[in-house]
Amino acid sequence: MRATIVTGVFAGIVVAALSAAAAQAPTPRAGTEQSGKSLKNDQDAANSRLLAAAEFFEALAEQAFSATSSKLQNLVSKAEKAGQDVNATLPADTQGALDKQLSAIKQAQKANNPSELALAAAEGYKILVSLTQGTKVPSAVSLLDYAGFRYNADLKSNPTRWADMQTAVEFAQEQWRSISGQISQASLQKSFNSALTRMEQAVEKKSAKAAASAVKDEQDLVDKLEVYFSKK
């Protein structure tokens, strides 16, 4: 009888202990959710690093034609440092691609060639923003900005690089198609379609004046796209 009682008590203790352990152990779903949050946090941190570095390349692409020599030197130095700081976190093949653009930036600066400088900066910008994932503002918006930088640098080259301007327009059209369906604001849709059409028509006519006007509108509209998506 005593053995039966002891056995029963022991069994009760074991069951209670197992129940407590089960209550404390994370369920597979909880573990999956925690892992998902961790991965999202890691990607958010990576996105922040990439976009922060990309800003210096963006500034260089925008100001390559207008900055004073001292300002340009400062912009180049900042882009170079930003690129070097983020490069170690990039995939191996991308590291080489970014290094190539950093080298091209320095060579263009030494040669006093603002169009090549702007183009290299734009390519560096493209490399970085293309690696972002799951951002509130789609990477396609940043790539539309890149297309505008490239088109503008081609336009200001001597001689004007009309063929590459057409390639830049086609790239922009591809990016626009990937996100235009997400935009419910009809006026923004219409304006952006118009800007891209005008950019292409300017190339067909080889009209520098029309091209300059169209690409300015495109880049202004990219800013509006950024605001639109950030508020969604």
Tell what function each PLM region has.
Residues 1-4:
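Positively charged n-region of N-terminal signal peptides that target proteins for export
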Residues 8-17:
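Bacterial N-terminal signal peptides
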Residues 20-23:
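Boundary at the C-terminal end of the N-terminal hydrophobic targeting segment
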Residues 25-81, 88, 137-142:
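Immediate post-signal-peptide N-terminus of mature secreted/exported proteins
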Residues 38-49, 64-71, 90, 106-116, ...:
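Non-transmembrane, amphipathic alpha-helical segments
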Residues 54-61, 110-196, 215-232:
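Extended amphipathic alpha-helical interaction segments
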Residues 80-120:
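Mid-chain, structured segments of secreted extracytoplasmic proteins
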